[in-house]
C-alpha cells in the first residue's frame, strides 16, 4: 500500500513537471507541432548487455571509437592494467582457444573469437555488490577482474545485422541512457517505469 501511495504521488508530480515542461515547449519550440503527431512511445530496454556490446560501432553514437585509452583498459585486483584479457568459460577457467587477447575492446563476431551473432557467450554477474565493484567509482575498469567471465565483458558485436540496430536507425538510440540502480534488471525496470524502488509495507 505504501508503495502504491508513493508511486501515485511520484507519478502525479512527474506528470505535473512534464506537463509544465511540455506546455512551455509547445509554445516556444519551433518543432513542437511535430510532437502532436506522436501517438505512442515504445522503449526497447535490452537486458544484460552494455551499450557498447550491441551499439558500440553505431554511426554517430558515442561508442567505442570515442573511448580514451584509460576508458578502454581493464585493471586487475592489484589496481594495475591487466597484461591481457582472459576469456573465462562456464567453469571459471580460461578458454584455451583465446589465450592472448589484448586488454582492449574486441569483436566477438570477428577473428580471433569468431562467435556467431546467434551464439551464446557467458553472462557476467551483475548483482548489486558485484556491479558496484565493477563500476569502481565511475571508472568502469574492473568489469573483467570482478567477474566470473573475465574478458568477455570487453566484447562487442558489429550490431548492424541486428533488428534492434535497424530500429535505432529509424527511430531513436539513447547513447547517454544510464541505468538508475546498481544490480540486475528487475530493479531497473521499476526505476524506468516509476523512478522508485519497490518496498513492502
Regions found by a protein language model. Name each.
Residues 9-201:
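N-terminal pro-sequences and low-complexity stem/linker regions of secreted or lumenal proteins
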Residues 1-9:
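N-terminal secretory signal peptides that target proteins for export/translocation
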Amino acid at each position: 500500500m505504501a508503495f502504491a501511495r508513493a508511486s501515485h504521488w511520484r507519478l502525479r508530480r512527474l506528470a505535473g513537471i512534464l506537463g509544465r515542461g511540455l506546455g512551455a515547449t509547445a509554445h516556444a519550440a519551433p518543432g513542437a507541432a511535430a510532437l502532436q503527431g506522436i501517438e505512442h512511445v515504445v522503449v526497447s530496454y535490452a537486458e544484460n548487455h552494455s551499450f557498447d556490446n550491441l551499439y558500440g560501432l553505431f554511426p554517430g553514437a558515442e561508442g567505442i571509437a570515442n573511448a580514451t585509452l584509460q576508458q578502454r583498459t581493464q585493471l586487475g585486483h592489484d589496481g594495475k592494467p591487466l597484461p591481457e584479457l582472459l576469456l573465462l568459460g562456464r567453469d571459471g577457467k580460461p578458454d584455451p582457444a583465446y589465450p592472448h587477447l589484448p586488454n582492449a575492446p574486441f569483436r566477438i563476431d570477428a577473428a580471433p573469437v569468431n562467435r556467431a551473432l546467434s551464439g551464446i557467450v557467458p553472462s557476467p554477474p551483475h548483482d548489486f555488490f558485484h556491479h558496484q565493484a565493477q563500476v569502481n567509482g565511475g571508472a568502469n575498469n574492473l568489469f573483467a577482474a570482478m567477474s566470473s567471465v573475465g574478458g568477455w565483458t570487453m566484447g562487442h558485436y558489429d550490431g548492424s545485422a541486428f533488428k534492434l540496430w535497424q530500429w535505432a536507425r529509424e527511430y531513436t538510440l539513447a547513447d547517454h541512457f544510464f541505468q538508475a540502480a546498481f544490480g540486475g534488471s528487475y530493479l531497473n525496470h521499476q526505476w524506468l517505469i516509476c523512478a522508485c524502488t519497490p518496498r513492502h509495507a
